[in-house]
Amino acid sequence: TAALSLGSIIPGFGSNSYQEILGANEKIRIGVIGVNSRGNALAQGFAKMKGCEVTYLCDVDSRALERCQADIHKISGRTPKGEKDIRKMLESDDFEAVVIATPDHWHAKAAIMAMQAGKHVYLEKPTSHNPAENEMLVRATLKYNRIVQVGNQRRSWPNVIKAIEEIKSGAIGKVRYAKSWYVNNRPSIGTGKVVPVPDYLDWDLWQGPAPRVPNFKDNYIH
């Protein structure tokens, strides 16, 4: 849930970094990129957090954008600015940090673009599609001196941290082998059928850095 991941966001910033982000502002101003489902939940979580203000939203789906603007207004009494084009959004000085919850193929590209624009980043997992993109991401953090916090919230759960501490202390002896797995009975999105691109969607921006496909299917947006 958003509440679980939010616990890992602000603690990821050291006190000096936190003050750097704040600057002369009393609140960290946040822009959220990708606000359908997960991004909307994160935007609402930040809007409810003391010391944060969601000032800008970006999504290529106008329905998701308008829905999230309304949700944030209910929480804060203010309506964030909205934009479909990440490039135009990142030209704004209305926020210091961004939350990225786009489809996966946009993650690394959006994070690097945000750092180039001087923004700190909370990036949803996965960080990239391949090791090369991850290496580019790391180089960008060093080049632009920006903070990137990845949404691996389970690493910040107290019970997980405690277990790691006990293992390192030798509580179960020398660990020679470990096995983990994840199970989630999510329904299939199906194969979809070819339909016209809906008028509420900027399909070119949705594809972004990904290779272009000839047709749009009705299960691409879900």
Language-model segments: residues:
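Residues that line or immediately flank small-molecule/substrate-binding pockets and catalytic motifs
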Residues: 59-61, 102, 179-182, 210
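Glycine-rich, aromatic-lined ligand/substrate-binding cores of catalytic
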Residues: 35, 199-222
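Surface-exposed, flexible loop/turn segments at secondary-structure boundaries
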Residues: 38, 62-63, 88, 156, ...
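A contiguous active-site-proximal alpha/beta segment in oxidoreductase catalytic domains
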Residues: 120-122, 127-208
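N-terminal glycine-/serine-/threonine-rich beta1-alpha1-beta2 phosphate-ribose binding loop
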Residues: 1-123, 132-147
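Redox-cofactor-proximal catalytic regions of oxidoreductases
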Residues: 49, 99, 155, 213-215
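Surface-exposed acidic, glycine-flexible loop patches that form ligand/cofactor-binding
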Residues: 21, 91-92, 169-171, 215
